[in-house]
UniProtKB/Swiss-Prot annotation:
This is Large ribosomal subunit protein uL6. The gene is rpl-9. One of its GO terms (biological process) is determination of adult lifespan. Keywords: Ribonucleoprotein, Ribosomal protein. GO terms for molecular function: rRNA binding; structural constituent of ribosome. It comes from Caenorhabditis elegans. It comes from the Eukaryota. The keyword Ribonucleoprotein applies. One of its GO terms (cellular component) is cytosolic large ribosomal subunit.
Amino acid sequence: MKLIESNDTVVFPEGVTFTVKNRIVHVTGPRGTIRKDFRHLHMEMERIGKSTLRVRKWFGVRKELAAIRTVCSHIKNMIKGVTVGFRYKMRSVYAHFPINVTLQDGNRTVEIRNFLGEKIVRRVPLPEGVIATISTAQKDEIVVEGNDVQFVSQAAARIQQSTAVKEKDIRKFLDGIYVSEKTTIVPTD
């Protein structure tokens, strides 16, 4: 069944501005600017007034209508990113061989050494706009921060996947670097 018209709106808070042109959305806030390209989805995106964006689909089937809510969720994540940012805290877990984590290239590359006693050095490059720091308050903790939740979570996933245990029983060998907490950079009430 096709609905004639389906839409959803996103209201932007005070201090956050946006522009829409050819389904490319730019959101600007106190922490910076994020740009997302939605040209692969066939739907209308139009500005209503100063602070509202309407996403509309005409004669859509079920999957196309689901994409409306997905686009609105992405835009809300962009708003959250330019206002409060995203922070993922990761902890190294090891049983015998301590995992050594260092940062290279101005906190743009994470180097992992001595994983399961191996001599190989694992290097994980971070996406643009994402920085990593080693926590001084907590032992064996890496903090990954940025404005775009997709890039921050992708960086955390790459770090976690680089320490995947191969050819051993994963119930016994639990060593690795895992996400322990997902928060925002600016504390919210």
